Structure formats: structure tokens, C-alpha cells
Amino acid sequence: MTRVKRGYVARRRRKKILHLTSGFYGAHSRLFRVANQKAIRALAYSHIDRAKRKRNMRSLWICRINAVAREQNISYSYLIKSLKEKKILLNRKMLAQLAVLDKPSFIKLINTHLN
């Protein structure tokens, strides 16, 4: 029986990895062994950074809410505590959208429910 050295299976696997790393710099996009390491690392980073993005967005929303709240001489923590006590079910994302896109209604929300 003739010997088959992986045939097209290995070529397909290598091509897939090289396609994944096609935008990378230098040998990282041309040589399979290096490209394979970089592809694994890139996929790991993308997995980690999806969780980081959630953290970063939450802190951005908090910064935006705090900025507009402090213009009204109210601290962020007091604002959130008061909204919870009044049972206003707006999460931080919604509050940040209001603060950025519809500032007058956000200020009205603060003034009517906190005073």
C-alpha cells in the first residue's frame, strides 16, 4: 500500500490558519508554525476582551451618569441609591443614554424624583 503524507487534509488545516492570520505582520502571516501560535493567542485575547468590553462599557456609563449628575450637585452614589428607593427600574445603560442623548429629560428625572 502506498504511503500518504496527510495529503490535502494537512494543507486545508494549514491554509485555514494562514487565512486567520492573513492581516498579521511579517512571518506571523506567512509561516505556519509562527502563525499557528499567533492565531491561538489572538483567539485567546478576543475571548478575554469580550469580558473586558462589558466592564469598560459599565464604567463608561457610570462616568457619563456621574458627569451629568454632578452638574446638578448630586453624587452618582446618591442618585443610584435614590432611584432604587423610589423603585425606578432604569439600569445604568439606559440612564447613560438619557444623560447623553436627552439631557433635559435626565435632569427632569433627577429633579422630580429626588427632591
From Swiss-Prot:
Q: Which organism is it from?
A: Chaetosphaeridium globosum
Annotated GO biological processes are:
ribosomal large subunit assembly; translation
Q: Which domain of life is it from?
A: Eukaryota
Q: Which Pfam families does this chain map to?
A: Ribosomal_L20
- Keyword tags: Chloroplast, Plastid, Ribonucleoprotein, Ribosomal protein, RNA-binding, rRNA-binding
Q: Which Gene3D superfamilies match?
A: 6.10.160.10, Ribosomal protein L20
What is the documented function of this protein?
Binds directly to 23S ribosomal RNA and is necessary for the in vitro assembly process of the 50S ribosomal subunit. It is not involved in the protein synthesizing functions of that subunit.
Name of the protein in question: Large ribosomal subunit protein bL20c
Q: Might you report a single GO cellular component term?
A: ribonucleoprotein complex
Q: Gene name?
A: rpl20
The places in or outside the cell where this protein is found are: Plastid, Chloroplast
Q: Does the keyword Cytoplasm apply?
A: no
Q: Which InterPro entries match?
A: Ribosomal_bL20, RIBOSOMAL_L20_CS, Ribosomal_protein_bL20_C
Family membership, please give it. Belongs to the bacterial ribosomal protein bL20 family.
CDD domains hit by this protein? Ribosomal_L20
